[in-house]
Amino acid sequence: MDNSIVEENGNSSAASGSNDVVDVVAQQAAAAVGGGGGGGGGGGGGNPQQQQQNPQSTTAGGPTGATNNAQGGGVSSVLTTTANCNIQYPIQTLAQHGLQVSIWGPGAWCQLSSVRCYGSQPEVATKDVQSVIQANPSGVIQTAAGTQQQQQALAAATAMQKVVYVAKPPNSTVIHTTPGNAVQVRNKIPPTFPCKIKPEPNTQHPEDSDESLSDDDSQHHRSELTRRPSYNKIFTEISGPDMSGASLPMSDGVLNSQLAGTGAGGNAANSSLMQLDPTYYLSNRMSYNTNNSGIAEDQTRKREIRLQKNREAARECRRKKKEYIKCLENRVAVLENQNKALIEELKSLKELYCQTKND
């Protein structure tokens, strides 16, 4: 298994030199029989008590620290520290099986919630083990000894050289065992900002597929297609009967070339369209443009004549209407005069009748 661990919390742990992530690799306690530890790749080693006295100690060798004898017991430990990492959290449970693991990093509370072994053996969950970190950064915190169940789980994981995950909610500690019987502990200090989970790189989100379109979008798309003008209808109206015969050979030639190209593949279809005879295609296009311009001029001229006739007819209609109104007005005036004359004549006749009757 790869020893490197990548944890994403919004900022990459390998992008900055002042990370809150520390790596502690404690080699097997059996190396103490040889009488000393081998040298690491940096200058941040030393006794844990010496590390506590220097709160700003950093390693110059990158991810690998110095190696020395710690606690006077001949146990070899490899320490890797970064800035402001000087607190030791020894896990006594692993020390009983020949391994000493120390977790270095700032913090005020640490809780080991569960230990699980992933392998051919069944999964074993242990009880919570709590440890309190002193407020003083130089304080040393000792974790309470684990139960017999925890020891069995850790011993089984060490013997099988499998992965043991120690879940710590505040610090997210993960322990890996390597083929060399070394334990790598990566202590992650919780960030002060909310974590973001990146999506899987293999996950595909099709955006242009037909399935991703909703019913409203599909209906709107179909309505737009139905509202689009029919270019074939416009072409037939403009071209007329003479152009229909001329346009058919060109469309047949393009259709035949497309069918031939489709049998050979999509690229062949595109190449066949591009390999058409330019003289054949351009000749039809030129004739189409010439006839189209003549037909357009003819239609424009006919439209102008029709509009002129309509204007003249409307003008004549308005003139006749005015004349008719004038005739009606004159006739009304004549009839009024005649009515007055008849009324006067009637009066005179009545007077004459009255006079003759009296006589």
Curated annotation (Swiss-Prot):
GO terms for molecular function: DNA binding; DNA-binding transcription factor activity, RNA polymerase II-specific; RNA polymerase II cis-regulatory region sequence-specific DNA binding; sequence-specific DNA binding. Residues 300-359 form the bZIP domain. Residues 9-32, 48-70 have a biased composition (Low complexity). Its main location: nucleus. Residues 301-326 are annotated as: Basic motif. Residues 198-257 form the KID domain. Residues 1-73, 185-238 are annotated as: Disordered. Belongs to the bZIP family. ATF subfamily. Homodimer. This is Cyclic AMP response element-binding protein B.
